Swiss-Prot record:
GO BP term, example: cell morphogenesis
Transmembrane region(s): none
SS bond partners: none
Transit peptide as UniProt keyword: no
Signal peptide limits: none
Subunit structure of this chain's protein: Interacts with MinD and FtsZ.
SUPFAM superfamilies hit by this protein: Cell-division inhibitor MinC, C-terminal domain
Pfam families hit by this protein: MinC_C (PF03775), MinC_N (PF05209)
Role this protein plays: Cell division inhibitor that blocks the formation of polar Z ring septums. Rapidly oscillates between the poles of the cell to destabilize FtsZ filaments that have formed before they mature into polar Z rings. Prevents FtsZ polymerization.
Gene3D superfamilies in the cross-refs: 2.160.20.70, 3.30.70.260
Assigned keywords, A-Z: Cell cycle, Cell division, Septation
Protein name per Swiss-Prot or TrEMBL: Probable septum site-determining protein MinC
Length: 221
């Protein structure tokens, strides 16, 4: 039997959503560059949907925004929640107009597996546990990045960057025996080293989201 030249099948993919909250493209550029500097390799090449629900200007320059994202090596596949005039621009630019439906009320799928790393993660290395928790029996060194769609458990020192709930899971946590991180992030909310030092006096801790803010709880000895 001859294999068909193409097949159309239903599937599901995780798409990152970039929310644009104001018209000023210069300010958007500055904030975007700041976020990309924190984890430069995490978003590169990943499909991205732009949420424009807060942009109500019919003459908004969507082409300029698209050019900005492309210049930062981000892959924009479409927009969502845009007014009709902007949706028309998107069509002309070859971008999909993705209907959000009830997506905003849908909880991310909880990870059902764990990725286990039985070694130190050294400077320059990046480990990503897709659709899983991440367990590290070792130290995450300065300049290293560990990322998980679920929670991150580090049975050693955390000196680099740890990003849990990368696909939007707000129930994800980060646990480290020694919390000396350059950055911690859960579902996009992040603290840099100075924030961690200002908000915590504990050496070992559990980082989690409380509402829309991060908090650190001391681990029992």
């Amino acid at each position: 039997m001859q294999t068909p030249s193409l097949e159309l099948k239903g599937s599901s993919f995780t798409l990152s959503v970039l929310h644009i909250n104001q018209l000023d493209l210069e300010k958007v550029t500055i904030e975007l560059d700041g976020k990309l500097a924190i984890a430069p390799q995490f978003f590169l090449g990943a499909p991205l949907v732009v949420n424009l629900s807060r942009i109500k200007a019919p003459d908004y320059n969507l082409a300029a925004l698209k050019d900005l994202l492309i210049s930062r090596q981000l892959v924009i596949v479409g927009i969502t929640e845009a007014i009709d005039e902007i949706a028309t621009q998107a069509k002309a630019l070859g971008l999909a107009n993705i209907k959000s439906g009830k997506q905003s009320n849908t909880q991310p799928q909880l990870p059902k597996t764990s990725k286990i790393v039985k070694q130190n993660v050294r400077s320059g290395q990046q480990i990503y546990a897709k659709n899983a928790d991440l367990v590290i029996f070792g130290t995450v060194g300065n300049g290293a990045e560990v990322i998980a769609d679920g929670s991150i458990h580090i049975y050693g020192n955390l000196r680099g960057k740890a990003m849990a709930g990368a696909s939007g899971d707000k129930h994800a946590i980060i646990i480290a025996r020694s919390l000396e991180a350059e950055l911690v992030s859960i579902a996009g909310q992040y603290w840099l080293a100075e924030n961690i030092q200002h908000n915590s006096t504990t050496k070992s801790g559990c980082v989690r989201l409380e509402g829309e803010s991060l908090t650190i709880e001391a681990l029992p000895l």
